[in-house]
Amino acid sequence: YEIASCLVGSEMCIRDRSAQRMKDVAKLITGDRKIVVLSAMSGTTNSLVEISDYLYKKNPDGANEIINKLAMKYMGHVEELYSTEEYKQKAKELIKSHFEYIRTFTKDLFTLFEEKVVLAQGELISTGMMNLYLNECGVKSVLIPALDYMRTDKNAEPDPVYIKEKLVKLLADNKDADLYITQGYICRNAYGEIDNLQRGGSDYSASLIGAAIGAEEIQIWTCLLYTSPSPRDKR
């Protein structure tokens, strides 16, 4: 396998439209068999942090305003990204489900645990949208949820034995796919709670995945530029 870590409309590429950026990324990753590690779309993480800040301050109205703006932004991306009504509808349902989930956190006590769940939605949405787009284009891609294999131990360090065991099985269960789409940065902790790797973002996730499966190459793509660190280069 090759591993490709891609920033989808990264802050460095803020002038790019995120839907067009996703199309550009799709062109880059198709071809050889790859595991593709994606970030959240441009501006999404900042908005999710802003939502969390409002909820910490017990200001659900402020949070809902940002949620609604972000949801509308994604609905606009759907119209630009997909060409068929079937896939537009699938993408809208995906986005609706994630934002309805985010809204549930405006009603109860908000802690660090809830914040990590909210922040994870950016990567979950971007990978879901990318996988749908690739499927619409006729690419045999499969979504491999990072929350099903990426885990940290009780010291908040990656658990390489667990990662390898779970990831190898997931790949074997989907061996007919040409592309595997997964999330960067997010994981579960030793207690099964949604968490994050705290550093390195998608690049760090890509290195952990590469080390787990003995990848031939890891490509780190940012604004159409890339570097190729060793699979054991866990920056």
Where do the protein language model's features map onto the residues?
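Single conserved hydrophobic/aromatic residue that forms the stacking wall/gate
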Residues: 1-9, 14, 226-235
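N-terminal glycine-/serine-/threonine-rich phosphate-binding loop
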Residues: 10-35
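Alpha-helix capping and helix-loop boundary segments enriched in small/acidic/polar residues
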Residues: 16-20, 39, 61, 65, ...
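Structural motif
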Residues: 11, 33-36, 117, 140-142, ...
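Glycine-rich nucleotide/cofactor/substrate-binding loop typically near the N-terminus or early
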Residues: 29-133
